[in-house]
Amino acid sequence: MALPVSLLMALVVLSCHSICSLGCDLPHTHSLGNTRVLMLLGQMRRISPFSCLKDRNDFGFPQEVFDGNQFRKPQAISAVHETIQQIFHLFSTDGSSAAWDESLLDKLYTGLYQQLTELEACLSQEVGVEETPLMNEDSLLAVRRYFQRIALYLQEKKYSPCAWEIVRAEIMRSFSSSTNLPQS
């Protein structure tokens, strides 16, 4: 389902505000990167989500990984990094290149890569400050299993256009949720 532009922009503002408030000196371009990735995902829609209602699926996004005050900065940044890395991997598959406009897909790769680079620099800075583990093993597994469920769904649906549309909408939702971290 296509999100109204006002709702999409509200999600972007919340995401940008929260990730930038982590205090790890992420450049302003990181929040712009969040906006750009969400806008690109929105532009990638090829078919009406209403024609794919029968294909909807609950992938079990691990919201608990991104909720609450259980994270310090390095763990929060690490969780976002893992999510973006998994999104990059998902859209880098052979099935993905056949499903999407190549130009938009290339822009998405570039945007995600820039996000990863900025987060890695931020992680390096934060790890030097604190000696805490980057990400709880259970949290890491929860994020990876979530993306495994998505990959399995695509495989079971034979990478159909509706399956990709459901996944695209899910990734928009999870990207918004994963970058909307608590302030620390």
From Swiss-Prot:
Record carries keyword Signal: yes
Signal peptide interval: 1-23
Domain of life of the native organism: Eukaryota
Location of this chain's protein in the cell: Secreted
GO CC, alphabetical: extracellular space
Main location: secreted
Disulfide pattern: C24-C122, C52-C162
Keyword Disulfide bond included in the entry's annotation: yes
InterPro entries registered for this protein in UniProt: 4_helix_cytokine-like_core (IPR009079), Interferon_alpha/beta/delta (IPR000471)
UniProt-listed CDD domains: IFab (cd00095)
Gene Ontology annotations of biological process type: adaptive immune response; B cell activation involved in immune response; defense response to virus; humoral immune response; natural killer cell activation involved in immune response; response to exogenous dsRNA; T cell activation involved in immune response; type I interferon-mediated signaling pathway
Family note: Belongs to the alpha/beta interferon family.
Record-given protein name: Interferon alpha-1
